[in-house]
Amino acid sequence: MSLATIAENYMMHNGNQRAIVPYVPPPYAYANAPTLGGQAGEMESMSLGILNQAMSSTTGASRALKDEKAAFGAMAEALRDPEPIRQIKKHVGLRTLKHLKIELASMRRRYAILRVVIFMSGCVTMATSMAGGLTIIDNEIYEDLSGDGWLSKTIHGLNLLCTTMLLAAGKISDKIQEEISRTKRDIAKRESYVSAASMSWSGDTSVLLKEVKYGDS
């Protein structure tokens, strides 16, 4: 073996040790883990489609259209959530729906009572106001009422009391009406989420939206 061959073999085996920057082989390139691109992409596209439908359909000026947008948003949220979170929200939502419906029935009873109070207060206020107006037109009625001081005071007191009750009951009924609308919207959202969480990919659903009422109906 010649000296040139020996030198070439030596440089081949020991060249990396004499290099200024030693050669480091690259790490082994592992294959990427499989992703759920198909199913996740399909769910995201469905969620975006539902949100686009909710945002671009109408302006949502009325309460019914606002409730419809809330239902669309709940369904989009159900399609976007992972399966474990979806099932947890479904079971919690079913429990919450019972309490919300009980609260809604209680608020409707209070609202009905307030409407009766408003009607009766309005009738008494109108009657006492008419009695006070007749005293201005007819002098005989004015003299009769002036002679009976307790009757005049009673009429004015009833007028003041019923007017105050009318204003107070009107404000309270407006607040209860807002709470009723907000509660009905929450019920519609949770029922839509439960329906979407129970929906199969074929479009069937095991929990149907029954007795969902929007707006003031």
UniProtKB/Swiss-Prot annotation:
Protein role: May play a role in the release of virions from infected cells.
Protein name listed in UniProt: Non-structural protein NS3
InterPro entries registered for this protein in UniProt: Orbi_NS3
Superkingdom to which the source organism belongs: Viruses
Family: Belongs to the orbivirus NS3 family.
Signal sequence annotation: none
Pfam families tied to this protein: Orbi_NS3
Annotated organism of origin: African horse sickness virus (AHSV)
